[in-house]
């Protein structure tokens, strides 16, 4: 991967539209800045005045709700990590296995609820909206927990577990069926010794559009695929107009999303990172608050005594 470059917002969708897996640390080149502040009081002063807040969220937010991340040493489904299965090639080679993986993830979400971090974001959006201020969430997560918490201004740049896309006619549809098809009932167990179900392709989820019946796939962005240009245009607009940015629970290593916050910081907008650890981008930002997002976000986004009302 080439060195990180700062580009005008209008060029992001042209240069960094393909989802790429994490690069090695030595290939992540970040400009060094002063150590970020951890002063909540200073952050809160900026928060009280901000008119247009962008919150970018990643897997770390949902991990606190018990959602598997499929990353790191223990992040396996059977013997595979997400980047082994979340590819067009994997689906073409073994659609049954890929559907088992996503069926498991869909079923797991039935028992998961938004945590304090999700709720703090949703409450902040509602409260500030009544003051004529804008809060928008740009999330890499596909679990819909932000939506479940009540977030309205939401850009799900990597898609959703609960949407499907037909590989024949291209129709995208919401799908909350459990199981998504009879053949997947009871399938998808994550334990390493579990054998593939090897479901015949004709019994996998099929399109219900009249006269189609094509094979459905999860409506998520897989590694090697481009993000939706229309969504990227919306992202560009939000990044160009925001006056405060929060980066919440994201590792800042999956592109193109890893590019967004550094680009905002490069034009002088305060960026605050909320994470359980530092990331390759930490020193690009004004603030860094270390700890669980469910602990740090409620304090950061609570009503401020000096909140400006339009």
Curated annotation (Swiss-Prot):
Highest taxon of source: Eukaryota
GO terms of biological process kind: negative regulation of reactive oxygen species metabolic process; peptidyl-lysine demalonylation; peptidyl-lysine desuccinylation; protein demalonylation; protein desuccinylation; regulation of ketone biosynthetic process; response to ischemia
Listed EC numbers: 2.3.1.-
Keywords: Cytoplasm, Metal-binding, Mitochondrion, NAD, Nucleus, Transferase, Transit peptide, Zinc
Signal sequence, renumbered to the chain: none
Reaction(s) the record says it catalyses: N(6)-malonyl-L-lysyl-[protein] + NAD(+) + H2O = 2''-O-malonyl-ADP-D-ribose + nicotinamide + L-lysyl-[protein]; N(6)-succinyl-L-lysyl-[protein] + NAD(+) + H2O = 2''-O-succinyl-ADP-D-ribose + nicotinamide + L-lysyl-[protein]; N(6)-glutaryl-L-lysyl-[protein] + NAD(+) + H2O = 2''-O-glutaryl-ADP-D-ribose + nicotinamide + L-lysyl-[protein]
Cellular component, GO annotation: cytosol; mitochondrial inner membrane; mitochondrial intermembrane space; mitochondrial matrix; mitochondrion; nucleus
Residues that coordinate or bind NAD(+): 58-77, 140-143, 249-251, 275-277, 293
Positions contributing to Zn(2+) binding: 166, 169, 207, 212
Pfam families in the cross-refs: SIR2 (PF02146)
CDD domains according to UniProt: SIRT5_Af1_CobB (cd01412)
Class of this enzyme: transferase
Presequence extent in this chain: 1-36
Subcellular localization: Mitochondrion; Cytoplasm, Cytosol; Nucleus
Subunit-level organization: Monomer. Homodimer. Interacts with CPS1. Interacts with PCCA.
PANTHER family: NAD-DEPENDENT PROTEIN DEACYLASE SIRTUIN-5, MITOCHONDRIAL-RELATED
Annotated family: Belongs to the sirtuin family. Class III subfamily.
Name of the protein described by the UniProt record: NAD-dependent protein deacylase sirtuin-5, mitochondrial
Organism: Pongo abelii
């Amino acid at each position: 991967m080439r060195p990180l470059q700062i580009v005008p917002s209008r060029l992001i969708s042209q240069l960094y539209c393909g989802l790429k897996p994490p690069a090695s640390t030595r290939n992540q080149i970040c400009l060094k800045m002063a150590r970020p502040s951890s002063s909540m009081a200073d952050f809160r002063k900026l928060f009280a005045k901000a008119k247009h807040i962008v919150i970018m969220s990643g897997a770390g937010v949902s991990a606190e709700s018990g959602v598997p991340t499929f990353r790191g040493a223990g992040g396996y489904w059977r013997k595979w990590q997400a980047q082994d299965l979340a590819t067009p090639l994997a689906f073409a080679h073994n659609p049954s296995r890929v559907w088992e993986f996503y069926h498991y993830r869909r079923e797991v979400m039935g028992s998961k609820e938004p945590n304090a971090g999700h709720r703090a974001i949703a409450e902040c959006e509602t409260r500030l909206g009544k003051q004529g201020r804008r809060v928008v969430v740009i999330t890499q997560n596909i679990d819909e927990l932000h939506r479940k918490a009540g977030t309205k201004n939401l850009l799900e740049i990597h898609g959703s577990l609960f949407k499907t896309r037909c590989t024949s006619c291209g129709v995208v549809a919401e799908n909350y069926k459990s199981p998504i098809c009879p053949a997947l009932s009871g399938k998808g167990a994550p334990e390493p010794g579990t054998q593939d179900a090897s479901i015949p392709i004709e019994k996998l989820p099929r399109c219900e559009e009249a006269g189609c019946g094509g094979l459905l796939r999860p409506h998520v962005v897989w590694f090697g695929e481009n993000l939706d240009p229309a969504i990227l245009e919306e992202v560009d607009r939000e990044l160009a107009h925001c006056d405060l940015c929060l980066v919440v629970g994201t590792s800042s290593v999956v592109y193109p999303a890893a590019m967004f916050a550094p680009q905002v910081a490069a034009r002088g907008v305060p960026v605050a990172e909320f994470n359980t650890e530092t990331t390759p981008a930490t020193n690009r930002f004004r603030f860094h608050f270390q700890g669980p997002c469910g602990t740090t976000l409620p304090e950061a986004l609570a009503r401020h005594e000096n909140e400006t009302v339009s």
